[in-house]
Amino acid sequence: MSGISFKSFVQSQYTPIPLPNHDFTGQTILITGASRGLGLEAASHFYRLNASKIILAVRDARKGPECIAFVRQYNPSSNTTVECWELDLTNVETIRQFVAKAKNLARLDAVILNAGMATMSFQAIDGMEKTLATNVTGTFLLAIGLLPALRLSGLRNNIRPRMVLVSSQGHEAAAFAERDADDIFAALNDADKTDMTDRYDTSKLIQLLAFYALKDTVDKSWPDSITFTAVDPGLCDTDLTRDIPLLIRIIHRIMKMLLARTAEVGGRCLVLGAADDEHSHGAYFKDGVIGSPPVAVTDPEGVELKNRVFSQLKSLLYSVDPQIMDACPVMESDEEAIRLN
């Protein structure tokens, strides 16, 4: 694990995660990647903690009834509303429809950006490698599209909504060889040159950089309006690695048997990260504990890379769906974005 101390990783994995006890009464919580794993387990915790409405964003709407039944199983008589909304982060039209639907919510307290994928084979969707399309461009087109709904919810209900990114310690291991390219995303989408064995870690680093840059952008235009928090749930026993080669999957399976947290415990981390609406702004939760942002986004090199990545990402997102971007007042095209277009 380049950039990661194995000793600290093991210690982290064996750190107990407390059961969340925050009261979410009256709140509406939206979770992406909620058909399985951490997202579904987090939804169950929000349900237990009295959330008023839980929105499960799932790629396959046919799984909706099963997901809702899982969340409701421990207290079927609860007054909490659980809904499934279709969302495929590689499909711009479903993102557009999802954002439009969210605008009709009377209240939106927290958005948990949990959906993600990992693969080592290059597969392009509309010209974008699938891991990037899911973990980066789709995630941030959705996040930016939901910002106006969060802002309006805050004003209407006198609250400070939260946007929570599910991160990964893997960002510390990312080689990210494309970081010095004139056009980072074009380099990442070059099937002949890019290293897919590094793709997941690199996507999580880009995700983290862009998330903190988005936080900075919102802070300037809408100060004290939305809390941005990143959460590292650690290695968890989910099927995230189901699409990687068999031999590596077997190695991962052994590592998970020895070190992984259960999906339920990982789900606790997401809930803990979403519980605080003020003091956790800009924080990075690890092992269920609030901490400072990673060095990757705070040291001079990281700050420069953060701003450059986000500038190029904005340009890319404007080319993907200018309507969603223009609908968010804080997303103004800067000179770099215009140049790249």
From Swiss-Prot:
Its EC number is 1.1.1.-. Pathway: Secondary metabolite biosynthesis. InterPro entries: NAD(P)-bd_dom_sf, SDR_fam. SUPFAM superfamilies: NAD(P)-binding Rossmann-fold domains (SSF51735). NADP(+) binds at residues 38, 63, 88, 114, 200, 204. Transmembrane segments: none annotated. This is Short chain dehydrogenase FGM9. It comes from Gibberella zeae (strain ATCC MYA-4620 / CBS 123657 / FGSC 9075 / NRRL 31084 / PH-1) (Wheat head blight fungus).
